Amino acid sequence: MSTRASALAEKRLHGLSVQTVGRRVWFAKVTIGLAAMLTLAGCAGRATNFLIPTGQQFAGTSRIDILAATTRQSENTQPGELYSGERAIGLHFADIAVSIPPASARKAGDVQWPASGGGNPLTEFTTIAAEKVGKEQALDRFYARLRKTPHRNVLVFVHGYNTRFEEAVYRFAQVAHDAKAPAVPLLFTWPSRGRLLAYTYDRESANYSRDSLEAVLQFLVKDKSVNEVTILAHSMGNWVTMEALRQMSIRDKGIHGKIKNVMLAAPDIDVDVFRRQVASIGDKRPPFYLFVSQDDKALAFSTRVWGNTARVGSVDPEQEPYRTMFAKERIKVFDLTKEKSGDSLNHGKFANSPEVVQIIGGQIASGQTLTDSRAGLGDKLGLVVTGAAGVVGRAASIAVSAPVAIIDGRTREGLSDQFNELGGQVKQTVGGVVAPLQQ
């Protein structure tokens, strides 16, 4: 081999070596962030497969019926598990009746999670009924509930990353119950594996599901029985929502007026991408309400994963260029940064104020916007609208109770299981990082 050829070969090998080192450094940074989040979140276990029907409702408990449209794969291997985190072809449907403990036995705004396989209906959330249904059966039940709803409104909930099917159901049941919203609860649940280290899989599952969410929204706005639709999305669920709305707007030259409000809680979306999404949706759209917190540690981790690009849910709305962007796009922003949270990651602040859940949920679902003077929200919550961007500060907590956060005391998996998501090459690095953090 010539001297020149040897030099070129050495250069290529050096380049590959640098790339390999770079990947290892990236994995190490990500792993350190994950280990830190695991430490912050504590060591509590995580209940699973608790959608086992009791077949009865106990005195003093409340019943919430949840219709679910899902792109998850059907699961029949374990009792209490209707759908897995794998991807299905097309939309599937389920109907679940959730029992919520008496007010004297629970703190509103929280989910009283049962033990795996069941629970005590007097102190924990339990399942009265749970079954997979076909499209026609789902429609029959949807219309029956819509007829019983005074304003024929629908509340669509899109959960975030690291959320199992049963967790999404219980969290949405809590939202619907505590908000006391006169609307039919409709859950759109996409194939999240419910694992901390399945972040990239979940993101691709979100992309996989945007057409299906659009199909659900198209059905709602075109059906004459439906009066109004409110959308509530959290974390990565905002990505699915914004993509579906973007597609709808491009297809129909705007968003149908039946979609009254869109609430975006802690969006895990790149700021620049969000700006383009909003621009693509255009002016013919419903009001957007954005809930942010600059001390959101989960979104700080996401920022690092995505190359230090700011996430919409953690920006300072009073700073440029965000202030001007929100003003231009007429987006109302609720800044929750100064609010205390029982969530060590500050990613689930929305579950801390049940009173606000009730006020916001009730007013929006009944057809009034958050800035409607008839709603009296300013007096009730101490809201003050400041600046052209419509950034909202508050004295009381704002809450639109989110689904299971990126991770909390109940959402930890065994490390040996989760680290398989990143591959064996990072296990050694993780072991070296987690051990000292847990001491």
Give residue spans per PLM region:
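Alpha/beta-hydrolase fold active-site loops
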Residues: 153
